[in-house]
């Protein structure tokens, strides 16, 4: 349930690139509404992708979630991830980008609050036959250089469409993202958005 899922919290000191980069990645625990885990890879100086294994030691399991610690293995994957960067000041790294659930993502700038999430792709919305929800299934995150934007590649899958995405995200007063996508039809689609 919602209360139990909210009681599982990522440990900030476990953030990827913690203490070595202005950017940090934090991860979301699989479960609750997020039944399709994603595989996350990072690409650093070696230019070779490294798969990030799920590790329950990255999370605090408080309250009603305390009995769940250790029940998820390293093959499980994560529900998604968020990116932190010192937008407001150098002492604190703000969350400014989130990839979580289906093909949803959202961004925020300095002194802003999140609004509605964007989607990588919407298929057959508001049709009698029902909507199809594509999912980002795999991510490759390029470790950014100092002062440069962060680049995220994503694989999108659904019964009707496969896709590849590139997000170049620049955190700032007005955080910006440049999105490139390549879509491949597997079946007929009535409505694409």
List each model region and its residues:
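A short, structured loop/turn motif at beta-sheet edges
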Residues: 45-47, 143-147, 171-175, 187
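Solvent-exposed N-terminal domain segments of exported/luminal and surface proteins
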Residues: 1-127
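A generic secondary-structure signal for well-formed alpha-helical elements
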Residues: 9-13, 158-160, 183-192
């Amino acid at each position: 349930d919602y209360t139990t899922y909210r009681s599982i919290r990522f440990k900030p000191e476990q953030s990827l690139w913690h203490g070595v980069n202005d950017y940090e990645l934090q991860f979301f625990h699989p479960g609750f509404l997020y039944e399709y885990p994603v595989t996350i890879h990072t690409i650093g100086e070696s230019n070779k992708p490294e798969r990030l294994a799920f590790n329950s030691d990255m999370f605090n399991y408080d309250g009603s979630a305390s009995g769940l610690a250790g029940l998820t293995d390293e093959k499980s994957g994560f529900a998604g991830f968020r990116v932190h960067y010192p937008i407001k000041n150098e002492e604190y790294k703000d969350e400014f980008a989130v990839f979580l659930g289906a093909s949803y993502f959202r961004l925020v700038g300095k002194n802003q609050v999140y609004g509605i999430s964007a989607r990588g792709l919407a298929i057959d919305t508001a049709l009698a036959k029902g909507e199809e929800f594509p999912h980002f299934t795999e991510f490759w995150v390029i470790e950014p250089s100092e002062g440069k934007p962060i680049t995220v590649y994503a694989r999108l899958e659904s019964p009707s469409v496969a896709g590849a995405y590139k997000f170049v995200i620049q955190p700032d007063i007005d955080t910006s993202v440049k999105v490139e996508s390549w879509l491949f039809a597997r079946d007929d689609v009535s409505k694409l958005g």
